[in-house]
Structures are given as structure tokens and as C-alpha cells.
UniProtKB/Swiss-Prot annotation:
The keyword Transcription regulation applies. Keywords: Activator, Differentiation, DNA-binding, Nucleus, Transcription, Transcription regulation. This is cAMP-responsive element-binding protein-like 2. Residues 1-23, 95-119 are annotated as: Disordered. It is found in: Nucleus. SUPFAM superfamilies: Leucine zipper domain. It comes from Danio rerio (Zebrafish). Residues 23-86 form the bZIP domain. The keyword Transcription applies. Probable regulator of creb1 transcriptional activity which is involved in adipose cells differentiation. May also play a regulatory role in the cell cycle. One of its GO terms (biological process) is regulation of DNA-templated transcription. InterPro entries: bZIP (IPR004827), bZIP_sf (IPR046347), CREBL2/REPTOR-BP (IPR039250). Residues 102-119 have a biased composition (Low complexity). Residues 10-21 have a biased composition (Basic residues).
Length: 119
């Protein structure tokens, strides 16, 4: 009993603490590792596909916004020269059929939600 210690009335043997390593077949462990690596690569591939699609959709949105900005710049230049573009005339008169882009559809959708919220 000279190697063991008595703590709180119990005899403790010296040795390693914690969980003892289980005797796992090395081939099974290697196969699990390979399977985990395959799954990791598949997740990584899906993540990159998602990010590429996200980037391309954002690039398309940026191009559309740039085109819209150019259109507004042209309108401003025309108004600086004293000309009123037909699109602006149509917006001012409320004629939505002649304008390719009108904000009135967005406002009607938003007005439905704001009226139902009771604000």
C-alpha cells in the first residue's frame, strides 16, 4: 500500500487519469476519417457554390442599379437643358402604362402592409 494514497477514506491507485483509450480497429478509424473528409469537402463545395450564386446575383443587381442611375442622370441632364423627358411627364400625370419603371406598384404593396398594421 505504499504506492496508493488514501483520500477521503478511499484508496486511490496511481496511474493515468481520465478516459482510457478504447481499442479501436485502425482500419475502421481510418475509414471514418476518410468519410469525414469526404463530407467536409462536399460541404465546402456546396458552400462555395452558394457564395458564387450570391455574388453573381449581387453583381446583376449592381448592374441594374447602375443602368437605373444612368437613366436618372440622363433625365437630370435633359432637365438642365430645359427639356422634360416623357417618362417624367408620365410620372407627373399619373399615367403608369407609358412608363417602363414606376414606383407606384411598390407603394401600393407597402400601403397594404402599413394600413393593416394600424400605424
Amino acid at each position: 500500500m505504499d504506492d496508493s494514497k488514501i483520500v477521503a477514506g478511499k484508496v486511490k491507485k496511481p496511474g493515468k487519469r481520465g478516459r482510457k483509450p478504447a481499442k479501436i480497429d485502425l482500419k475502421a478509424k481510418l475509414e471514418r476519417s476518410r468519410q469525414s473528409a469526404r463530407e467536409c469537402r462536399a460541404r465546402k463545395k456546396l458552400r462555395y457554390q452558394y457564395l458564387e450564386e450570391l455574388v453573381s446575383s449581387k453583381e446583376r443587381a449592381i448592374c441594374a442599379l447602375r443602368e437605373e442611375l444612368d437613366m436618372y442622370k440622363q433625365w437630370c441632364l435633359a432637365m438642365d437643358q430645359g427639356k422634360i423627358p416623357s417618362e417624367i411627364k408620365a410620372l407627373l400625370t399619373g399615367d403608369e402604362q407609358k412608363t417602363p419603371q414606376s414606383c407606384s406598384n411598390k407603394t401600393t404593396k407597402n400601403s397594404k402592409y402599413s394600413s393593416s398594421s394600424g400605424i
